[in-house]
A protein has these predicted regions:
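Conserved DEDDh/DEDDy metal-dependent 3′-5′ exonuclease domain
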Residues: 2-4, 149-249
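Short active-site loop/helix that positions an aromatic residue
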Residues: 186-196, 379-393
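DnaQ-like (DEDDh/DEDDy) 3′-5′ exonuclease domain used for proofreading
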Residues: 1-173, 199, 289, 295-309, ...
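Common nucleic-acid-contacting/processivity interface regions adjacent to the catalytic cores
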Residues: 271-390, 399, 467-515, 527-528, ...
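C-terminal, non-catalytic extensions of nucleic-acid polymerases
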Residues: 471, 542-745
Length: 745
């Protein structure tokens, strides 16, 4: 690995003899303490000072520079409240990454060793097994060197199990500990049970036997994204899956994600059973199956993230535990630092008048069924606009605002060719935003986008998982610039970049729409979303590219219009329900689903089955009386198909309405002796008498048929099949005894 595992530095990591700021760096499984390469400084306004460029300022600022010995001397209480710190941060590792880009490459490390684990926990009282009262039955372990191991409890107590697991981690000494939802569940549950037995796990799980550092966790259920440790990196594979666009609209349960990627994980029924209802051999196979699936997914995702850290030249842990804006923060921060442009404020401080602005263009022009579907897809639209117009925080700034007039959209180019003035009408601001773009030097965004696009090309042509991971990693790096520059809390970027990109993107996408309609007719355009135009006819993308580039050159004479390009995606049948809600059949007959109608995470199997039948019939154009009779036939469904779920995301007292469904379910669960808390999941049925928890409904006769009948009717309406709706269920559907009587007669 071309970078170290992690780096750490705070006010306290100072050499007491010399006063030097130090960094603690972990690589090759060992700790190194080295001197920070930075010169620590702050600035004060001074009429006799030097001239400095400051981001967002139209003129240079007179400032005096003051050097100090270490980070501690930059504490707020140690310097004047009028002083300024470049980047507004006292994060030492971040500033080393920015000011000394190659520093951490001096600490190359071996390929990181890893250990994955999964807990199986028994419920002490029938509630969801989270908390100190619920013992751990088994811990499954997998390692990068091929070990597969299960530690089982002795049938009475899990104290010995916990100690054995902790000792295994200590002896194996992995660089990375990973699991699936381990931050939201496994780690807090492990520490809850360890606390129950008065065991301090930190000396085992931290390196250096550190007794107090890190491992702060709670049952956050995906609300907490990281856990810090001493000398190791914690990776929650769930966080990878939750950002995987390939899984859009799908459940992110480990079993579901595993099956999506071709695995066959073992399933056990926990609807009515506890883990201890199964024998130890079954538990052993089950927990190792989960560990194997998690290891596969870890290896699948990790390659990409390690590569990004290496390209950024930052410690692996620093990148992995960072916010989405980190890539842009580091790269733009480096560019600004190299050009001696200081950053003293955040976006929302530079532009307090901008609380929000006009978004990308989205519209549905022709809802319903379309037999043929093609998409004009802009290639890396936002980065391409930045390239074409030389946009970047170091070249782009807002000059002023004028009255809103969409007819004034465009550009004035200086005769010298050294800058251009963009006019971006914005209907949310109700202003025309006048933006200056300097052209004397290439912007940092231009250089970085160009570099990463060139780096990506060979990987796009190569096969294999590693090449695909690196290609996707570079794509992520290119596509993060836009969001980061519009982030109100970003210091190393400017919202002028985002405003310009979004405004020109709207012009381009509507231009593509007009070009398509001009040649193929007004009815050819079905849907527009940000960077794509969906059509119902085949299209000539080369002609569209020529038209767009000619328009770009005409309106923006100093632009590099060759960066703007579109590709063509082809689909089979498709159905468009509403903006953001559609389904398309791909050429390989798989489906692309988008929108709330098609999300099935909390839906019942009844809903999913009805929806899937409707999709197939609507796209195949096979809806007829027999199909409608079948879809309304409740004999096709079993009682378990009607099971739904809800999760309690706040304390009961915080819900505003006592009739809220979650409050009803929690009240029933408490009445049955279950302990309910934030994160508790309730599985329930909608019955004739209201809602009932799982286990209290045995027959489909108890199910509220009218409620589920209306679900079918509503879906038929969404798919433009109103004429096929049966408004009321017959008496024989509501009461199966009537059906039996009818059959008898």
């Amino acid at each position: 690995m071309k970078v170290p595992l992690s780096a750490f530095s705070t006010y306290s990591t100072v050499n007491r003899m010399t006063g030097e700021q130090q960094l603690i760096i972990w690589h090759n499984g060992e700790k190194r303490v080295v001197k920070s390469p930075r010169t620590h400084k702050y600035y004060m306004h001074d009429k006799k000072g030097r001239e400095y460029k400051v981001l967002g300022k139209s003129t240079t600022q007179l400032l005096r520079e003051y050097n100090v010995e270490n980070l501690g001397e930059l504490r707020p209480e140690s310097i004047s409240p009028l002083s300024k710190i470049d980047g507004l941060t006292r994060n030492e590792v971040e500033r080393v990454c920015i000011e000394h880009p190659n520093f951490f490459t001096e600490f190359e490390s071996r390929e990181p060793t890893s250990l994955g684990f999964d807990l199986e926990v028994t419920s002490a009282d029938g509630s969801f097994p989270s908390g100190p009262q619920h013992p751990i039955v088994a811990v499954g372990i997998v390692t990068d060197d091929g070990q597969r191991k299960t530690i089982l409890w002795d049938g009475k107590d899990d104290k010995e199990l916990i100690i054995k697991f902790a000792e295994f981690v200590k002896n194996y000494d992995p660089d990375i500990i990973y699991g699936y939802n381990l931050i939201g569940y496994d780690i807090p549950q492990l520490f809850a049970r360890a606390g129950h037995h008065n065991i301090n796990l930190r000396p085992y799980l931290n390196r250096d036997n550190h007794e107090t550092y890190g491992w702060e966790s709670d049952f956050s259920y995906h609300k907490k994204s990281k856990v810090e440790t001493w000398g190791r990196l914690i990776v929650d594979v769930y966080n990878f899956a939750s950002r995987d666009y390939a899984l859009a609209g799908l459940s992110k349960r480990l079993k579901d994600v595993s099956r999506f990627y071709g695995l066959k994980p073992i399933e056990l029924d926990f609807n009515l059973n506890d883990i201890l209802d199964y024998d130890l051999d079954t538990i052993n196979e089950y927990v190792l199956s989960d560990c194997d699936a998690t290891k596969y997914l870890f290896n699948h995702y990790f390659t990409q993230h390690k590569y990004i850290a290496e390209v950024l030249k930052v410690p692996l842990e620093t990148y992995m535990n960072s916010a989405d804006s980190f890539i842009t923060k580091i790269l733009q921060g480096r560019a600004l630092f190299k050009r001696n442009i200081l950053t003293f404020d955040k976006n929302n401080e530079r532009h307090p008048e901008i609380e929000s602005f006009q978004a990308a263009h989205i519209d549905l022009y022709s809802p319903g069924f379309h037999r043929y579907n093609y998409k004009v897809d802009f290639a890396s639209m936002y980065p391409s606009i930045a390239l074409a117009l030389n946009l970047g925080p170091d070249t782009t700034r807002i000059l002023r605002y004028e009255d809103y007039d969409i007819g004034k959209f465009g550009c004035e180019s200086a005769d010298s060719g050294l800058y251009m003035i963009l006019t971006i009408p914005d209907n949310v601001l109700d202003k025309n935003v006048i933006i200056r773009v300097d052209l004397k030097d290439k912007s940092c965004l231009y250089k970085m986008c160009k570099q990463f696009k060139e780096m990506r090309e060979p990987y796009k042509r190569m096969g294999g998982h590693e090449a695909k991971s690196k290609s996707n990693g570079l794509k992520i790096m290119v596509n993060t610039f836009y969001g980061a520059n519009t982030n109100p809390y970003m210091s190393y970027g400017d919202i002028a970049v985002g405003l310009a990109i979004t405004g020109i993107a709207r012009w381009l996408i509507l231009g593509a729409k007009n070009i398509v309609q001009k040649r193929y007719g007004d009815d050819a355009v079905v849907y527009i979303h940000t960077d794509g135009v969906n059509t119902n006819c085949d299209i000539d993308v080369e002609w569209i590219n020529d038209e767009l580039r000619n328009a770009m050159t005409s309106l923006f004479p100093l632009s590099e219009s060759e960066w703007i390009s579109v590709d063509k995606d082809e689909f089979k049948e498709g159905f468009w329900i509403a903006i953001g809600n559609y389904v398309l059949r791909n050429l390989d007959n798989s489906l692309t689903k988008h929108g709330s109608t098609f999300k099935s995470r909390s839906r019942s199997q009844f809903y999913v089955k009805v929806l899937n039948k409707l999709i197939d019939a609507r796209l195949d154009n096979t809806v007829n009386q027999d199909f409608i009779k079948d879809i309304y036939n409740f004999e096709n469904y079993e009682v378990d198909d009607f099971l739904q779920s809800r999760t309690m995301n706040q304390n009961i007292g915080d819900y505003k309405n006592e009739n809220d469904l979650v409050v009803q379910l929690a009240t029933k669960a408490k009445a049955e002796g279950q302990k309910v808390k934030i994160g508790s999941s309730f599985y329930y049925y909608k019955t004739n008498g209201g809602v009932e928890l799982e286990g209290n409904v045995d027959s489909i006769d108890d199910i509220d048929i009218k409620y589920h009948w209306n679900i079918i009717s509503n879906l038929l309406q969404k798919f433009d099949l109103t004429q096929w709706i049966n408004k009321k269920p017959p008496i024989t559907a509501l009461d199966r005894k009537q059906q039996s009587l009818l059959e008898f007669v």
